[in-house]
Amino acid sequence: MQIYNKDGYFEVENVLATKLPFLLVCGGRGVGKTFSALKYVIDHDIKFVFLRRTQAQVDLISKQEFSPFTPIANYLGINIVSVPLSKYNTGFYKAEESEEGKLTPVGPCLGYSMALSTISNLRGFSAEDVTLMIFDEFIPERHERPIKAEAAAFFNAYETINRNRELQGRSPLQALLLSNSNDAGNPIFTEMKLISKVEMMKKKGQIYSLDYDRGIGIFMLDNSRISKAKAETALYKATAGSEFEEMALMNEFQEFKTDLIKPMPIKEYIPICHVGEITFFKHKSNGTYYCSTMLFGDPDMYGADENDLKRWYRKYNYLWTAYMRNKLFFEDATSEIIFNKYAN
């Protein structure tokens, strides 16, 4: 599948042509993810929702100076403005410019901006004509504050827009999720149980995966010509060899690079406890521990609710000490990410 244009930038058309309802695209900085998606909806007159994580982000992009449509409008030689529709969202419109330079909206609404953190306030609105939801920067940067039950908020947002169109014989809403490779343990990957799949794709150098049974497509924008060219620019010369460079140019998730991910011969270990989705084992002789998604034997059992996690951690907090001392190993990145989620 061709996912780059002749200039080396990401091209969204073939991704959307898969017709899969959920399309997750992770790639380096500045390879054209957002530009390609927004240009496509304008070129093809597709009604869309442009989703960001927080209301502050939506408020910012609603200003003309920070609009993601400004570079597209400049490229196409048109004007696109944002018009407030409610306290929480705006509509994007084509616009005419007066002799005084004032922009006036004309024609129908092209699409809407919405925030994941406040979309529940808009559940009554009709989105019958929306066929594409673009969730930009769906993986938060590490310094960003998490949204409580973030994945559930996204699923509810999808349901709010999709409604019962499939029961009426219509195609489901397509959700195009775009981001940099900031965090493999992000809420969407975790709740959709995609971490192991993404980890395997990275190990194999696999650019895309299409799962028609689940309706999910995953695209890793590795080996972009744009990323290679950016390596010679000032910022990336200064940050050569850093985690930032690996994320921004090489599309690397740091969670997949730990030395603690090391499949072990399970027969050498004894199960001691199982919590949520993971089991912990103690080596029979060398004092190390192992964490896996496998469950066998008769370990202490704990759920993943708040009270069970507290009870588990109170008894087994020494597992964190072992982790800090590099004596706790993991079957895969999923196991380590879940452990960090439960222990923190």
Task: For the regions a language model picked out, list residue spans one by one.
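Phosphate/NTP-binding elements of NTP-utilizing enzymes
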Residues: 2-344
